[in-house]
Amino acid sequence: VEVIYRASQGAYVGVVTVHPKSEKYVFIHGPENPDETWYYDFHHRRGVIVESGKVSNLDAMDITAPYTPGALRGGSHVHVFSPNGERVSFTYNDHVMHELDPALDLRNVGVAAPFGPVNVQKQHPREYSGSHWCVLVSKTTPTPQPGSDEINRAYEE
């Protein structure tokens, strides 16, 4: 068994996806030093990439307005490389919406593209910068209309 990364400071990692062409890995990473207000949950996770022993955040997170373009306002999970390995799709839950009302924190799908880095001017101790520009590609609504294309929860890819 080869260990490519070991989490520290009480963080958890999981759901590893391997790059289709090189020895590169992307996976879910939970928060370091979790506490009663910030713990391993959908809207507190991030994507992390490991390549040649170098570790970097895939996505940036900015939960303080004004928000940074290309950064997420919550957690990414279930990361999957595109067939050519250039982009990464992921599922997403929004911390800001969860704080307003958990019923508004609807799962979406996003794409991380290699147009970074995305540098966050950290105004909250849990904010961080990332290597990729992220954008959501799904649209959800809390109350989808029957017979419409509206959804209240998006899934992988």
Language model: regions and residue ranges:
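Sequence signature of WD/YWTD-type beta-propeller architectures
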Residues: V1-E157
